[in-house]
């Protein structure tokens, strides 16, 4: 992989367009978690230190493309930046696509990229407009690196210089460290509701990790190979595929589970073995024996890859499995990497972000990188380097 890095370029007094990932949860104009903003700051701060003219763009949520929707405006991010960079002039508008004049060390935040018609289908005219704003394009949104859109991919065809920001490089380096030459033993914890969405990830990780621990609806599909699991969430169409994986690799499934009769917040949990689950019961978390076994595996590991909760952690009585796994990873001296939307929510819930070696900002991009897919944004950076170096 040959790409330019922002750290290698002279960006002083240059117009720098940074594609950040500022897709944070916002309710009633209040930012609920600033994790992605904090991850984006080092690249922005470096550009300011180098006296670049800094333009920032990002998407937020899923508005109807081409239309302004207040709920999805980046205005709360603008307010956040004003406090963070209180000695810096910061501009915010939806009209910057026609050009903006900045002095070195100033910032312009563009409005939500998805308010621009053509963003999602990688429109060439829009991509060209983005490229006209800058001398150098910095791709720093790992969380959107798997999307072939104008602001993440199309711009690379027109801009003279495209490079990777600090966050994108750190994401790639951390994933390579876990996947290429992991310290052993390596354990991968894969939770979530569907085997179908993570089958390729499981298949790839099974060939790399010494042990795979499955949780959530994914584990239920593996349990359904041998047991009747009541009304638990699982995928009947993937039971055969799950069996092929289990028979070939070291995949750990729960030996006991917390079950309930109703999927609701205050439902009482009963611990049962998989051969004792009734028709009107559903699995919603690991049981104590499973937790004990899994803690032992994690404690002995030197590399830990974690994607997804192992139970319905939003319900207090079905939180223990996810909580104990999260805290065991946090207390481990192993190299740990965590990624995926719900995983970040768990990390926030138990306040362990400073105890994980690397927390990926990517969801889909995180999974596709693990699968071995070439992410469109990285492909764009490679092509830009190759074509503009001739």
UniProtKB/Swiss-Prot annotation:
Keywords per UniProt: ATP-binding, Cytoplasm, Glycolysis, Kinase, Nucleotide-binding, Transferase
Enzyme class at the top of the EC tree: transferase
UniProt-listed Gene3D superfamilies: Phosphoglycerate kinase, N-terminal domain (3.40.50.1260)
Pathway linked to the protein: Carbohydrate degradation; glycolysis; pyruvate from D-glyceraldehyde 3-phosphate: step 2/5
Gene Ontology BP annotations: gluconeogenesis; glycolytic process
Protein location: Cytoplasm
Alphabetized Pfam families for the sequence: PGK
InterPro entries registered for this protein in UniProt: Phosphoglycerate_kinase, Phosphoglycerate_kinase_N, Phosphoglycerate_kinase_sf
GO CC term (a single one): cytosol
Superkingdom of origin organism: Bacteria
Residues bound to ATP: 198, 314, 340-343
Documented EC number(s): 2.7.2.3
Gene Ontology MF terms: ADP binding; ATP binding; phosphoglycerate kinase activity
Catalytic activity annotation: (2R)-3-phosphoglycerate + ATP = (2R)-3-phospho-glyceroyl phosphate + ADP
Annotated binding of substrate, by residue: 21-23, 36, 59-62, 114, 147
Record text on subunit structure and interactions: Monomer.
Entry's family note: Belongs to the phosphoglycerate kinase family.
Family annotation (PANTHER family): PHOSPHOGLYCERATE KINASE, PHOSPHOGLYCERATE KINASE 1, CHLOROPLASTIC-RELATED
Protein name: Phosphoglycerate kinase
Species: Buchnera aphidicola subsp. Acyrthosiphon pisum (strain APS) (Acyrthosiphon pisum symbiotic bacterium)
């Amino acid at each position: 992989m040959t790409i330019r890095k922002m750290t290698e370029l002279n960006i002083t007094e240059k117009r720098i367009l940074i594609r950040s990932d500022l897709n944070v949860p916002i309710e009633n104009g209040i930012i609920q978690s600033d994790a992605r903003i904090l991850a984006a700051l080092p690249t922005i701060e470096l550009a300011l230190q180098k006296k670049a003219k800094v333009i920032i763009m990002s998407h937020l949520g899923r508005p109807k493309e081409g239309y302004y929707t207040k709920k999805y405006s980046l205005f709360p991010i603008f307010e956040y930046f004003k406090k963070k960079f209180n000695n810096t002039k910061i501009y915010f508008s939806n009209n910057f696509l026609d050009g903006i004049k900045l002095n070195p060390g100033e910032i312009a935040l563009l409005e939500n990229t998805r308010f621009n018609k053509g963003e999602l289908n990688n429109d060439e005219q829009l991509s060209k407009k983005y490229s006209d704003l800058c001398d150098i394009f910095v791709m720093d949104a790992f969380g959107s690196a798997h999307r072939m859109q104008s602001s993440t991919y199309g711009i690379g065809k027109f801009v003279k210089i495209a490079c990777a920001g600090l966050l994108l490089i750190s994401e790639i380096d951390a994933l390579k460290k876990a996947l290429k030459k992991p310290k052993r033993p390596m354990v991968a914890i894969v939770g979530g509701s569907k085997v179908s969405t993570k089958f390729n990830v499981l298949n790839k990780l099974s060939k790399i990790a010494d042990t795979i621990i499955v949780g959530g609806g994914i584990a239920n599909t593996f349990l359904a190979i041998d047991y009747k699991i009541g009304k638990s969430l699982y995928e009947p169409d993937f039971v055969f595929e799950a069996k092929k994986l289990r028979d070939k690799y070291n995949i750990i499934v729960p030996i006991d589970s917390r079950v309930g009769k109703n999927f609701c917040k205050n439902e009482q949990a009963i611990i049962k073995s998989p051969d004792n689950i009734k028709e009107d019961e559903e699995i919603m978390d690991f049981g104590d024996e499973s937790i004990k076994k899994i803690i032992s595996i994690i404690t002995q590991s030197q590399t830990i890859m974690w994607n997804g909760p192992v139970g319905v952690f939003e319900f207090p009585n079905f939180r223990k499995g996810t909580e104990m796994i999260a805290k065991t990873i946090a207390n481990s001296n192993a190299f740990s990497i965590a990624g995926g939307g719900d995983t970040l929510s768990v990390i926030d819930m138990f306040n362990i972000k400073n105890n994980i070696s690397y927390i990926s900002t990517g969801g889909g991009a995180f999974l596709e990188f693990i699968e071995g897919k070439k992410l469109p944004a990285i492909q764009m950076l490679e092509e830009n380097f190759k074509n503009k170096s001739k």
